[in-house]
Amino acid sequence: MAAAPAQGVPTQLSHVALRVRDVGRAVDFYTNVVGLQLRNRRENAAFLGASEEQSHELALFGLGDTAEGPDPKGVGMYHMAWQMASFADLEQFHERLLTHGAKIAGYSDTSCNVMFFDPDGNELEAFWEAPKELREEARRPGGNPLPRLAR
C-alpha cells in the first residue's frame, strides 16, 4: 500500500524570480530564444511562462545597467532547468540557442542537456529526461549527442 501524501509540504516549484539589468533585453531573450510566453509586463518587471497551467514560471525584475551580475564563486542559485518534451524538442532548442548566439556553458557527459547563459550571466539548462528504459544509454559517458551536433 502506498504511503499517504505528506501534508503541509509544497507540491511543486511555482516560479523563479530573477534580477536582471534590462527587462526588455531579458524579455527578448526569454521569449525569442528560450520560447516562453510573455504573460504580463510592467515598467520594470515581466512575467513569463511555458505552461498554460500556471500564471507564470519566470519573473524578471530590472535593476539597471550598472547592476553587478551573478557571482559563480558566491552563494546563490547555480542554475534553473527547463525540461523539454522530447529529444527532438531539445535538438531544436539547442539549434535556436546557437542561431541566436547564446553563450553555451557546456553539456553533461551523462545526460541529454545543454547549459547556457542568459544575457545577464544567469546559468540555465534545457534537458530531456529520457524514458526509463533509455536512461542508462543516455547516462553513459558520451551519451549526450548535443556537443557533437554543436561542432
Predicted features and spans:
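Conserved N-terminal glycine/acidic-rich loop preference
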Residues: A3-P10, A17, G49-S51, E57-A59
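Short secondary-structure junctions
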Residues: G35-R41, G101-A105
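Conserved short beta-strand elements that form part of the metal-binding/catalytic scaffold
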Residues: Q37-G74, F117, E123-A130
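Alpha-helical elements of the RecA-like P-loop NTPase motor core of helicases
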Residues: V27-D28, E91, E125
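Amphipathic alpha-helical segments
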Residues: D22-Q37, R96
